[in-house]
Amino acid sequence: MATQEQKIIFRKMEEILRSYPKYQKRIEVEIENLKNPQIKKSCGPGGQGGNSYDYKSEVEQIEELKQRISNNISRYEEIIFRIDECLNIVQDHKDYSFIQLKYFDNKTYEEIADVLNISLKSTYGMRNRILEALEIHFKTQRLIEF
């Protein structure tokens, strides 16, 4: 039986694994934004019509926007790199297929049991074993802190 601390850690790990495809998609979106940066016109402080004395040319605004987008891409790539490092270390684990099915394909435990032709109880065991194997690597990569 997992301790309360273990359950919290596993939940954090699962959240990170579920977010992995979202980070990949976000990079694609940001690359498109970088190709065609759009300055949003806004009203209020700091925007068009505001009382800010810090007026920047459109070129400066576009350059700042490109820099922010590049920073976002770098952050997402760093997170993906760290997750990939962890996954590469455990890719030979007998329960590795669970990660793809559960967190990337969003299958339920019942669907995983059907796909793998195993009992429902066995899917929970797979989850626990693969997350236990990943835990130290997630901590080493500072994806989770505890």
Name every feature range the model reports, one short phrase each.
Residues Q91-D105:
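Short amphipathic alpha helix immediately N-terminal
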Residues M1-I89, I136, T140-F146:
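N-terminal interaction/assembly modules
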Residues L87, Q91-K94, S122:
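Short coil/turn residues that cap or connect secondary-structure elements
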Residues N117-I136:
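DNA-recognition helix of helix-turn-helix
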Residues E111-L116:
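Short alpha-helical "recognition helix" segments of helix-turn-helix
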Residues I79-R82, H93-D95, M126:
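N-terminal positioning helix adjacent to the helix-turn-helix/winged-helix DNA-binding module
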